[in-house]
Design a protein with these regions (language model features):
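Short S/T/G/P-rich N-terminal loop/turn motif that feeds into the first structured element of a domain
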Residues: 1-198, 202-226
Length: 226
């Protein structure tokens, strides 16, 4: 399946008003035509005054038809008009991902099933950029060695995809935790695990990574993942 990831950066002080309009007008209209998003978040750590949301498509041609239907909806026109009045958004970014076989999300509209304890939730969103020709070897080693360790010790993997349109030689994935303390404790345990040391040694010999970027996200009140 395909995952479209969008990141919108707002001018300082303008994001709450934009989110309110999206929750009340733009979001319901989008769900009506595009189906529910996988998740909708604000950035807690990273570049702030940002929202990040992801939506799945089983057929990429469906996306074009669904977007056209939304553009013709009076409620979407209303949303665009009202958000233009407040001038909230400074930058909009989008990229298209394809899920890997071990991604938990494999179908558009797939319902989120919470598998972690507690009532809170934060998301560790990660983007890894690779030297050309090195990504597939890293993914193979990750699926075989690294992922089993993380599934045993970390929180809940939400999705995992490779960039199809946008910066290529890139993977994007996200893990959910009960909170920042939960994340820290689990990652410290992982770092001390012999299985993780084996993974790091294996991928270290490949020399695949060019850059790693992480953000901490918080779900909005209307996010399916929460």
């Amino acid at each position: 399946m395909f995952i479209e990831q969008r990141i919108y950066t707002a001018h300082p002080g303008k994001l709450p008003a934009w989110l309110k309009l999206y929750e009340e007008v733009g979001g319901p209209c989008s769900v009506r035509h595009l189906g529910p998003p996988i998740g909708f978040f604000t950035v807690e750590f990273g570049t702030i005054n940002r929202v990040l949301f992801v939506r799945g498509f089983d057929d990429i041609d469906d996306r074009e038809r669904q977007l056209a239907a939304r553009e013709a909806d009076p409620e979407w026109v209303r949303f665009r008009t009202e958000t233009a009045k407040i001038g909230a958004l400074a930058v909009q970014e989008t990229k298209l991902l394809k899920t890997v076989p071990f991604s938990p999300v494999q179908k558009a509209g797939q319902a989120f099933e919470r598998k972690i304890g507690g009532t809170g939730l934060v998301v560790d969103h990660r983007t890894y950029d690779f030297h050309p020709g090195k990504m597939n070897g890293w993914i193979e080693a990750y699926e075989r060695i690294g992922l089993p360790v993380q599934q045993r010790l970390l929180g809940q993997l939400l999705f995992f995809g490779v960039t199809e349109c946008g910066p290529i030689n890139q993977v994007v994935f996200a893990w959910a935790y009960e909170g920042l303390g939960d994340r820290d404790r689990r990652r410290n345990t992982m770092a001390a695990d012999p299985g993780w040391a084996e993974f790091m040694k294996t991928v270290g010999q490949l020399g695949p990574l060019k850059q790693q970027t992480t953000m901490v996200l918080k779900p909005t009140a209307f996010s399916a993942i929460r």
